[in-house]
Amino acid sequence: MARTEGDSWDLANSVGATATMVAAARAAATRRSRPIIADPFAEPLVRAVGLDLFTRAASGEVDLDEVAAGLGFVRMVDTFAARALFFDKFFADAIAAGLRQVVIVASGLDARPYRLPWPTGMRVYEIDQPEVIEFKTTTLARLGASPTADHHPVGIDLRDDWPSALRAAGFDAARPTAWLAEGVRIGFLPPEAETRLLDNVIELSAVGSRLAADYGTINGSSAESQQLAQQMTEGWRAHGLDMDIAGLTYPGEHTDVAAYLRSHGWKTATADHGDLVLAAGLAELTAADRQSPASTIGFVTAVRSTD
């Protein structure tokens, strides 16, 4: 089913199920003998959502890479582990630069407010659908987990007036901020909402602020991309999952985040899927690996150096 303006979802279906899939991949990566990331909260969060395949993948009963490769997504666990590490390093660099305010947009099952070693005085805001925020904070509280920063969850849809909700939660636009938009700028918002999101981030960012994001679309317009999307949709459906890959994304021209930020005076650095995998110390992507949907996604880190 195609996405519509104002549609809704939860962590067991549609866009929400992709967040659960990514968390299952982080859990699988954490279980490896030589893990590049450690996310002890990924498995219990996935288990609480209750999608059988991802629960078994998170616990090690099922090889998620094997399942995903059969659907056309090779090296899924490496992909999301390397992505998580890339963004973890972004926060480490922001901390080293003296930033003490963070905003994570569309946080999903991201547990960074709980798992990263934030310095004293760090304020971490995270924004997502109210039901997602409530589910995650309640589940982690039941596990006895506590945030490692001054944590401010903000439950609101990114298509709504989230800047006002963020300010109401205590966000200070006069302080440099480290912004993270992980897994949201890949077609899950309408093109106009993507641009509006960037405009809002720019407006709320003091000099010295930083942003990290991935961007592109997991569902291209080419016949090959459409065929792969259909293959993945049918494969996930065979596993009892509601993830219509073509229907998850909005059509239209999506914003090149790096170019947009540069046009507004931000200094940017870009990377691709292969760069992240190599930086993580993992095996280089083969030609076959580069046929994965992940290879269509770009990555950017940016710094606001002037008003």
From Swiss-Prot:
Gene3D superfamilies: Vaccinia Virus protein VP39. One of its GO terms (biological process) is methylation. The keyword Transferase applies. Pfam families: LCM. GO terms for molecular function: methyltransferase activity. It is an enzyme of class 2 (transferase). The keyword Methyltransferase applies. Exhibits S-adenosyl-L-methionine-dependent methyltransferase activity. Belongs to the UPF0677 family. This is Putative S-adenosyl-L-methionine-dependent methyltransferase MUL_4430. It comes from Mycobacterium ulcerans (strain Agy99). The lineage of its organism: Bacteria, Bacillati, Actinomycetota, Actinomycetes, Mycobacteriales.
